[in-house]
């Protein structure tokens, strides 16, 4: 079983799909579970939105532990802590909470997302706009556990052989791994496979894609699409706007816009009701 815990719904879905597209039956929980989760089958993935990104550090830590307590993990199960590749939210606190709750010794954190131009080198996250964030300093400042760093040169020359070094270190251990290419992320995943006990993997959807999947079935055909598909977005990012325009051009998307001015300055329920009524009409067509 593959268990993913993310701090928001986007992270839960874009990580879950990395397993679904390789033949692993994947379920996404859109909100934190309130009761114990049934133990899924061997070739399944469960991706949970903990809704913790906007919480304060201690609340995020507590929320992560609460979610972890709802699932029974076996030694052979893969645990993946999804973090934002821009490292927003409380990535260190949540990773520590997941590692502690799972009773595992080592967390392998490789948050790079090379296809998005987000890479980690020298422990520093570098973004396409030229900005940077010192992740190694962030980990050392906010972690209560031991922290180590695998530089890019060591990753590429030693690869999975680094596992032997990690098991000799103080545990529990948070290990930050440099990665500039997708091949680097595959090397990071190989370290986890070489450990004598299962780690907690931590990263973006790119690391999830790099993880080996037992009995992988590449190019699994998608199930037939539903008669109607509802797409919901509240993002102000230009990339999201471009995606919506693409859907309009390719799929004949019908848009129902919520008027933010009315939500702020008029009774919000009226605007919400108007949008819901129009959505209902479209979905019934």
Residue ranges with predicted function:
Residues 3-29:
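N-terminal signal-anchor module of multipass membrane proteins
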Residues 37, 98-103, 272-284:
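Short amphipathic alpha-helices and their capping/turn segments at secondary-structure boundaries
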Residues 124-275:
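Conserved, well-structured core segments that form the ligand-binding/active-site neighborhood
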Residues 16, 34-58:
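N-terminal beta-loop-helix "entrance" segment that forms/cooperates
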Residues 3-5, 45-49, 108-110, 174-178, ...:
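Structural motif
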